[in-house]
């Protein structure tokens, strides 16, 4: 992880190459744009370069000249010349020791050239924007292009001839001037824009590496001094004649001035300039900074940054084809990006150059920073962004954590704010330079104030709120650091500036008299105005350079050889052009205004107060990583005198309270208690470098020093008095109250207002001041001093840890929620300090142990959630930085034992007692130390790994500790702290990824990792996966009340928002007396009538009959029943589902606990569609399998017992916590900890893709694929691939959980990803899906996947695909016909048993409506095919299919066999008696299947008493396994009531126990009820039951009312009265005689060979499904479809085939078919064909009897009605072309009407109507002709 601290190690200083490049956009855009010549100052340091700067004490070595050759000792003269050359201006040497020998002059000049090529690289890169010129220069140097180098004194020149050019044309003359190991100017004739061109670089490199090859000469003035007068004249004349054109005019002008009688300057000043003699003593030795080019390049960079730019994405897939990230993830990335990736890259590289210059003590640091700052502030967009981000909601807790970041502009704004904060941080370090003079510090203070005002002024021109100005930290942290005096705070002899002896550069200028025009700082480097870049690089010395005297002796001539210091010309000349600095610095004088009226405090206006207490925190810059050197972020709320007023002591009590004062009371005492100082806020002030104290003389004078003192004293008592959020903004409440008035009276202008609350650094606590000193020393290269100080600070930090406890919130109430802003500040401050201490301490081996302790202390810091989003992200980032630093420190035995101890605590769970913020970074570090492989992914092992300190159990301990950390639950909810939850997830993801990669080959470990990561133990909302992949069974801890994806058990009695009491008014379908358990999740108001509360299995009969308004059945997708997936969910509220997906409802493995007394209503289908399975299996936060700690204290629910009692069977319960109608109040973020959320779903998807990439797979979801990075590797690692698949599936479950409309989606990139992975993985993935697709995928998605998988070559995969297809058939109503038919084909390809299961599943789904009739006819044909297969010879009676316990067929169709919805088992024909099971006493307890949904119940028009369902539902008591009634489905369309067959009981002894007669065929007698007996009532003993409504068989729809009969066990033979039109006497029939009176088998079946009972079952099933198809035809009958009256609609053949089937089964079946056909067939032609064919199949001799049979009569009537409708319909749309067809239809109609006695009369009426119609006479003539000629 790259470091971002201010004090980073040399090899790690951040430049662009290190930074995190998000989406690679910076790289792409910078490289692809042609005009970006400036390459962002990349390459300014050699990547491998160490700290070999020459500026260290003795100027480090880089040149060959410094080495001792062959062991020779360097002479003392050389050593002294070298030191003098580095430190002392040559003019001073001459002044002090007048006759300097020429040889010594040459040696000093020799050593004055810089020795380190890194400096050349740095300045070349600065000037050119990249290291390219340096590289080219290096090439020229190596190619020996530098010719004739000559050094004259301090002037170096040469000719550079690039090899490919002809010498005269391509030769460039280069000149370089230098002084004290710094190049002070350079020039070249090549005309390049930047002064540091390739040729200058080549010459400098030549001089550094081949110093001995350069010809050395003394300065020109030295040589001239040796000439005689005539020699001098000769020299001048020869010079003029050599270059007459260039020199002659200048020579004449100089002669004129010298000979003038006037007192010209040249005559009045002694001495003359010499460019080769080095600068004057008063000049600063400064590297030549090419300011104009640099400024232009900075402008270009900033312009490009501010302007709109195309967004370049490196991965099309991830950006465009995946869903957009949710707000929490987007905001996290937006806030983290400026901390990690540095943008704009160029400016950040310049800032890092400034930092490096500080370290080298290069005086260009401040000028460069000034150029940068000036340029940044000229762009209003930059200042606007900086201001808005630092005063924005994400930096205050008032945002409600709901802000959504909007893409690129938001990212740019945060990056910009981060960049500006870093600038302020660097200014703060600049003013804390220990060698800085007070005068210079005052100048900088004035400049910083000007800049702050400029920002505010820019902002005012924009649209920003003026009221937030004082919340904007801006330059305040740097301004506060100006009020500081090293001499008082931390004097270091020889380092800190002192008034008595000026140390820096040996201050030789003091030897000269002070010059009037000299710069004020008395020679201090930064204060000297810099020459403008426009000056000639090799310029004639201004007046004041070396001059040789004319005519005096040598000894006397040396003195006047330079201008005396009194000559002010030079100062004037240098000050003039560079006045830019001076004028700004002088602008505010000494900043006196700023302190006037420091008492003016203002209460924030109401709009500000809405920002809540922590706006103060806004000032924290997320990116200010200068560990404490960051902006002190706040200076302006409380008022304390900005300067240290003369009347205030150097360290007054701290009054600056960025947060409510009470929060700071412990600071000085707790943090670094030292000395008797009063409590101070320093610890919380992140930006303040500890400790600086101002003295009077280095502070700007103040206008009201008294008021400052008064304030300070007055404020101190207020600290800690009351917890009022508003105290954040003023020192105490009393001051705040009068703030407005004070402001009005005492404001002396805007600047005063802005800086009124400034808190001088010196007023911080002693330890804060010392931290500031340590940072400054480290930043400015004083590493020894910094190291000593940091040891003290580290020990103090460990001895006095900060107090981060949060007081419990007061009484309930939103406004009183506890503020954690103080703790947050303390935490971020502490981490900042810890990282700084780590950085400094780790540089020296003797401090490694202390550094390790500081790092562990920081990682173990327990903190509350941060008060703002920005701080939340920053804290997480800081932790990761500390962990990265800690990993680099070598560890000894004591450190390892500490780590083991922490790992043990993590494993045992004792480490975190209260943790909203989990110690995941600590766990990650422990895992890295104990378990990470010897060679890490980067190929290097941190020095941390010392094999001698390792112990055998370390790896296992590390693994268990890490896994335990993955399972930790946070105690905060996503709604309150979205970014904390996001950060926790990301840290868990990183840790889990490391674990999975490390243990990818160990399946047992992978299972443990996934169990914790996907939170399997808590059984809350988790997908049921890995059951087949990892064989071990999952613990069924259903009673763990963890509301979570990772929830910790909540306290008993805590009312969770998603639970509600069922004690309220019973909703329709609610069970009023079902016990005190929570009614699964909705508050009552959240249960609209539209939610299908139909009681389902498991409810007592009373519940099943609870009144419920008719017609409230919502549309198919809105229904639903179980969290997991209720098979019923799609079409009908009460359809049962297949066993293997199911709840314990009809699951034979859940015996006693799923009894009627279950208080948890665990099987009520409360909500739509199929809520995610993951939650459906008893895993909801309010899961019914909750224990007694549930929200309403329900007794230990049977759900828990069920879960544990069911052994291998999975406990699956309904999740009802979320309403799929989109009514969940917390649609985005849950208010309960550890709940699923949109952000969690997105995170887990990304994690799944990452795991897949690590496995070697390709995570692409589209055609834009990129080649896999794993070269010859064959496919992804299988175990990791499966892990990725499971994580993705879990994510999809979470996503569905929070997406109300997921069932209706048509495309999802997530789903396509999952199906793609399933195809790659093969059968293992499909097996997982068979178990748990229900909450994750929709049936069409599953069917599509199964279809794709069925084409694989692997037989296992094909088999798994068939299983998958079978698993989605119970939801056939959600599939289209092609999908269903393909699934049936897949099952058929496997074996007959699977085909049977498939057919039954489709049939069961169809009973609720929604399945196409064509599909059902296809199913019927499949049943018939099975019949033919089994009847065709191999009639093996499958015993498994006929026994209840073995349950081959039974188990397969358990959903159908469980008598759901009051019907008989699927094999039950409506005219047969439903299966009767024998109780121990052989009592007959039949199930009355009076109302099979084959005959749809009446709709709204029917006259039920409300709430009584038209069907009969009796509770069966079968001994083999408990079965439950379900509330039957309402038909999709209300229809007229249909006749129903009556049902007769059969003695149980007649059949094997629990088996339906339909299975048994002709071997057993079975009873049917012919229509003539329809009015007979049935009587038999019934156990005590609820009232039952019976609809007897009747012919006239709508006439009878159902009768409710209370059955009681007291009456052994209660009767069911049956009504047919009029009341008939009830016949009481005993069961036993009925058996003998049963009808014989149908005649078709009585051939010589006995029929296989199993094949007969298939035949019955084919008929049954065909009839269901007819019913479906009727349901869609009212559509105005062209096929309605077609002569041969598509279903004709199927209907006729069904008639043949009915005839095969017997007369009664034919009658039943007639009833169905009358309902389902609309075409009069088809109806007529059916009538005629039926008459043929029945005995034609008794045709009239048949016609009188009710069913047949109804069919004929329907046919006649259809003809009437047809004729009416055709008359409307009739054209002459249709006449023939119409006439034929009339003829057919006549034959139909002839079938009934009154038919012809009706037909004649039709003809009369036809005659009266408006049609033409021609039509009537043709019709009448046809009628007369047609004889029926």
Curated annotation (Swiss-Prot):
Residues 1176-1211 have a biased composition (Low complexity). The lineage of its organism: Eukaryota, Metazoa, Chordata, Craniata, Vertebrata. One of its GO terms (biological process) is positive regulation of miRNA catabolic process. Residues 1021-1042, 1146-1161, 1435-1446 have a biased composition (Polar residues). Disulfide bonds: none annotated. PROSITE patterns: ZF_SWIM. GO terms for molecular function: ubiquitin-like ligase-substrate adaptor activity; zinc ion binding. Its main location: cytoplasm. Pathway: Protein modification; protein ubiquitination. Belongs to the ZSWIM8 family. This is Zinc finger SWIM domain-containing protein 8. Component of the SCF-like E3 ubiquitin-protein ligase complex which contains CUL3, RBX1, ELOB, ELOC and ZSWIM8. Interacts with DAB1. One of its GO terms (cellular component) is cullin-RING ubiquitin ligase complex. Residues 55-65, 1121-1132, 1455-1465 have a biased composition (Gly residues).
């Amino acid at each position: 992880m790259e470091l971002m601290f201010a004090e980073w190690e040399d090899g790690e200083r951040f430049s662009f190459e290190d930074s995190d490049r998000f989406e690679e956009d910076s790289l792409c855009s910078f490289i692809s744009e042609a005009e970006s010549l400036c390459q962002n100052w990349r390459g300014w340091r050699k990547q491998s370069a160490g700290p070999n700067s020459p500026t260290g004490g003795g100027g480090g070595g880089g040149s060959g000249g410094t080495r001792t050759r062959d062991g020779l000792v360097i002479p003392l003269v050389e050593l002294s010349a070298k030191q003098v050359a580095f430190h002392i201006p040559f003019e001073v040497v001459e002044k002090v020791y007048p006759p300097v020998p020429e040889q010594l002059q040459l040696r000093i000049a020799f050593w004055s050239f810089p020795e380190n090529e890194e400096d050349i690289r740095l300045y070349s890169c600065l000037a050119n924007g990249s290291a390219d010129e340096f590289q080219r220069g290096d090439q020229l140097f190596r190619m020996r292009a530098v010719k004739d180098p000559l050094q004259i004194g301090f002037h170096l020149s040469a000719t550079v001839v690039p090899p490919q050019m002809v010498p005269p044309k391509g030769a460039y003359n280069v000149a370089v001037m230098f002084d004290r190991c710094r190049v002070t100017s350079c020039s070249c004739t090549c005309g390049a824009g930047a002064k540091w061109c390739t040729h200058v670089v080549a010459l400098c490199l030549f001089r550094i590496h081949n110093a001995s090859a350069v010809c050395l000469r003394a300065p020109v003035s030295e040589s001239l001094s040796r000439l005689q007068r005539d020699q001098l004249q000769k020299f001048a004349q020869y010079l003029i004649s050599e270059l007459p054109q260039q020199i002659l005019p200048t020579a004449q002008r100089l002669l004129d001035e010298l000979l003038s009688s006037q007192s010209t300057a040249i005559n009045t000043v002694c001495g003359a300039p010499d460019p080769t003699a080095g600068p004057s003593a008063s000049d600063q030795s400064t590297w030549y900074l090419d300011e104009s080019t640099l400024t232009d390049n900075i402008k270009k960079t900033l312009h490009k940054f501010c302007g709109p730019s195309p967004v370049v994405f490196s991965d099309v897939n991830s950006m465009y084809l995946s869903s957009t990230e949710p707000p929490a993830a987007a905001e996290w990335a937006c806030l983290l990006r400026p901390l990690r990736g540095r943008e704009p890259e160029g400016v950040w590289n310049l800032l890092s150059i400034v930092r490096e210059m500080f370290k080298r003590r290069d005086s260009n640091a401040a000028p460069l920073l000034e150029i940068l700052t000036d340029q940044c502030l000229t762009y209003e967009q930059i200042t606007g962004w900086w201001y808005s981000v630092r005063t924005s909601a994400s930096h205050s807790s008032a945002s409600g954590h709901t802000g959504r970041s909007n893409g690129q502009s938001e990212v740019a704004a945060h990056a910009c704010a981060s960049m500006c904060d870093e600038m302020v941080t660097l200014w703060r370090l600049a003013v804390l330079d220990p060698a800085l003079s007070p005068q210079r510090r005052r100048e900088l203070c004035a400049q910083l104030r000007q800049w702050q005002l400029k920002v505010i002024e820019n902002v005012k021109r924009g649209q920003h709120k003026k009221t937030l100005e004082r919340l904007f930290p801006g330059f305040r942290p740097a301004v506060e650091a100006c009020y500081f005096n090293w001499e008082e705070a931390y004097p270091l002899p020889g380092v800190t500036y002192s008034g008595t002896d000026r140390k820096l550069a040996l201050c030789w200028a003091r030897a000269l008299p002070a010059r009037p025009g000299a710069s004020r700082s008395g020679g201090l480097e930064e204060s000297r105005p810099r020459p403008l870049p426009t000056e000639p690089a090799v310029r004639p010395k201004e007046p004041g350079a070396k001059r040789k005297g004319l005519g005096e002796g040598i000894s006397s001539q040396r003195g006047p050889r330079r201008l005396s210091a009194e000559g002010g010309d030079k100062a004037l000349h240098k000050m003039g052009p560079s006045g830019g600095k001076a004028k700004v610095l002088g602008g505010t004088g000494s900043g006196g205004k700023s302190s006037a009226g420091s008492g003016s405090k203002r209460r924030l206006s109401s709009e500000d107060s809405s920002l809540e207490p922590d706006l103060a925190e806004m000032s924290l810059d997320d990116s200010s990583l200068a560990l404490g050197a960051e902006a002190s972020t706040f200076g302006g709320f409380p008022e304390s005198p900005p300067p240290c007023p003369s009347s205030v002591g150097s360290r007054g009590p701290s009054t600056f309270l960025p947060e409510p004062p009470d929060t700071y009371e412990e600071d000085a005492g707790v943090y670094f208690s030292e000395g008797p100082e009063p409590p101070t806020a320093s610890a919380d002030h992140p930006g303040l470098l500890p400790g600086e104290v101002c003295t009077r003389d280095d502070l700007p004078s103040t206008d009201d020093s008294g008021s400052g003192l008064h304030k300070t004293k007055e404020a101190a008592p207020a600290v800690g008095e009351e917890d009022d959020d508003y105290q954040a903004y003023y020192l105490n409440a009393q001051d705040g109250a009068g703030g407005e008035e004070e402001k009005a009276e005492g404001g002396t202008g805007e600047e005063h207002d802005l800086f009124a609350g400034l808190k001088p650094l010196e007023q911080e606590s002693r330890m804060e001041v010392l931290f500031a000193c340590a940072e400054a020393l480290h930043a400015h290269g004083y590493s020894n001093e910094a190291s000593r100080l940091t040891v003290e600070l580290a020990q103090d930090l460990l001895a006095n840890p900060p107090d981060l406890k949060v007081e419990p919130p007061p009484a309930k109430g939103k406004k009183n929620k506890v503020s954690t802003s103080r703790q947050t500040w303390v935490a971020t401050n502490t981490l900042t300090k810890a990282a700084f201490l780590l950085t400094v301490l780790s540089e020296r081996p003797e401090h490694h142990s202390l550094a390790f302790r500081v790092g562990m202390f920081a990682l173990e810091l327990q903190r509350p959630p941060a008060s703002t989003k920005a701080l939340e992200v920053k804290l997480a980032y800081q932790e990761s930085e500390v962990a990265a630093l800690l990993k680099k420190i070598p560890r000894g035995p004591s450190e390892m034992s500490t780590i083991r101890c922490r790992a043990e605590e993590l494993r045992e769970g004792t480490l975190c007692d209260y943790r909203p913020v989990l110690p995941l970074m600590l766990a990650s570090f422990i895992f890295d130390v104990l378990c990470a492989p010897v060679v890490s992914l980067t190929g290097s092992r941190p020095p941390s790994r010392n094999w001698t300190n390792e112990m055998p159990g370390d790896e296992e301990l590390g693994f268990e500790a890490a896994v335990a950390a993955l399972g930790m639950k946070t105690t905060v909810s996503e709604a309150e702290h979205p970014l904390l939850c996001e950060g926790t997830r990301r840290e868990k993801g990183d840790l889990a990824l490391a674990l999975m990669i490390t243990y990818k080959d160990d399946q047992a470990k992978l299972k443990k990792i996934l169990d914790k990561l996907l939170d399997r133990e808590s059984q809350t909302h988790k997908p049921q996966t890995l059951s087949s992949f990892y064989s071990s069974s999952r613990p069924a801890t259903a009673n763990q009340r963890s509301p979570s994806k990772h929830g910790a058990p909540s306290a008993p009695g805590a009312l969770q928002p998603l639970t509600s009491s069922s004690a309220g008014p019973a909703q329709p379908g609610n069970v009023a007396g079902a016990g005190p358990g929570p009614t699964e999740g909705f508050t009552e108001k959240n249960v609209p009538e539209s939610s299908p509360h139909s009681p389902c299995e498991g409810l007592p009969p009373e519940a099943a009959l609870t009144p419920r308004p008719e017609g409230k059945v919502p549309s198919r997708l809105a229904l639903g029943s179980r969290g997991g997936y209720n098979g019923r969910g799609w079409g009908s509220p009460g359809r049962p589902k297949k066993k293997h997906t199911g709840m314990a409802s009809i699951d034979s493995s859940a015996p006693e606990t799923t009894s009627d007394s279950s208080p948890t209503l665990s099987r009520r289908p409360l909500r739509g569609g199929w809520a995610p399975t993951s939650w459906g299996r008893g895993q909801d936060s309010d899961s019914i399998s909750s224990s007694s700690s549930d929200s309403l204290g329900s007794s230990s629910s049977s759900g828990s017992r069920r879960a544990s009692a069911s052994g291998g069977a999975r406990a699956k319960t309904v999740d009802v916590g979320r309403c799929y109608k989109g009514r969940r109040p917390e649609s985005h973020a849950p208010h309960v900890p550890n709940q699923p959320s949109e952000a969690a779903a997105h995170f887990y998807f990304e994690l799944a893709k990452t795991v897949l990439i690590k496995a070697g797979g390709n995570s692409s979801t589209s055609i834009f694929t990129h080649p896999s990075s794993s070269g010859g590797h064959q496919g992804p690692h299988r175990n990791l691939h499966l892990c990725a698949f499971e994580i993705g599936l879990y994510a999809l479950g979470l996503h569905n959980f929070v997406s109300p409309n997921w069932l209706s989606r048509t495309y999802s990139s997530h789903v396509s990803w999952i199906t793609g992975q399933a195809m790659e993985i093969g059968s293992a993935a499909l097996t997982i899906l068979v178990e748990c697709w229900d909450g994750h995928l929709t049936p069409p998605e599953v069917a599509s996947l199964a279809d794709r998988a069925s084409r694989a070559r692997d037989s296992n995969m094909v088999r798994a695909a068939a299983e998958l297809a079978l698993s989605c058939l119970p939801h056939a109503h959600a599939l289209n016909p092609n999908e269903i038919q393909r699934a049936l084909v897949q099952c058929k390809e496997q074996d007959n048993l699977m085909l049977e299961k498939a057919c039954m599943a489709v049939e069961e789904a169809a009973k609720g409506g929604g399945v196409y009739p064509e599909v059902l006819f296809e199913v019927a044909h499949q049943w018939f095919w099975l019949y033919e297969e089994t009847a065709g010879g191999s009639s093996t009676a499958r015993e498994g299919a006929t026994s209840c316990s073995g349950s081959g067929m039974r188990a397969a169709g358990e959903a159908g066999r469980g008598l759901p919805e009051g019907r008989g088992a699927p094999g039950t024909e409506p005219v047969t008696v439903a299966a009767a099971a024998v109780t121990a006493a052989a009592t007959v307890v039949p199930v009355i299947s009076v109302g099979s949904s084959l005959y749809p119940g009446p709709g709204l028009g029917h006259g039920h008493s409300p709430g009584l369902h038209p069907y009969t539902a009796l509770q069966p008591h079968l001994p083999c396994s408990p079965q439950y009634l379900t509330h039957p489905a309402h038909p999709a369309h209300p229809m007229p009531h249909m006749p129903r067959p009556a049902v007769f009981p059969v003695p149980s002894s007649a059949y094997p126990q629990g088996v339906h007669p339909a299975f048994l065929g002709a071997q057993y007698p079975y009873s049917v009820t012919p229509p003539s007996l329809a009015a007979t009532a049935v009587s038999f003993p019934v156990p005590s039951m609820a009232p039952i409504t019976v609809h007897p068989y009747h012919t006239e729809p709508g006439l009878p009312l159902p009768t409710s009969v209370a059955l009681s066990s007291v009456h052994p033979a209660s009767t069911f009265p049956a009504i047919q039109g009029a009341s008939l006497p009830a016949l009481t029939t005993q069961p036993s005689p009925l058996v003998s009176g049963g009808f014989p088998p149908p005649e078709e079946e009585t051939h010589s060979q006995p029929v296989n009972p199993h094949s007969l079952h298939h035949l019955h099933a084919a008929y049954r499904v065909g009839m269901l198809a007819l019913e479906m035809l009727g349901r869609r009958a009212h559509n105005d479809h062209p096929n309605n009256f077609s002569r041969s609609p598509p279903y004709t053949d199927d209907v006729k085939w069904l008639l043949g089937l009915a005839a095969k089964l017997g007369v009664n079946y034919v009658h039943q078919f007639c009833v169905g056909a009358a309902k389902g067939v609309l075409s009069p032609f088809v109806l007529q064909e059916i009538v005629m064919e039926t008459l043929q199949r029945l005995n034609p001799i008794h045709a009239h009897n048949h016609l009188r049979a009710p069913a047949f009569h109804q069919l004929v009537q329907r046919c006649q009605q259809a003809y009437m409708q047809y004729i009416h319909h055709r008359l409307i749309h009739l054209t002459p072309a249709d006449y023939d067809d119409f006439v034929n239809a009339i003829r057919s109609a006549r034959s139909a009407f002839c079938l009934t006695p009154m038919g012809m009369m009706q037909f004649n009426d039709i003809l009369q109507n036809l005659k009266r119609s408006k049609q033409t006479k021609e039509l009537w003539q043709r019709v009448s002709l046809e009628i007369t000629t047609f004889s029926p």
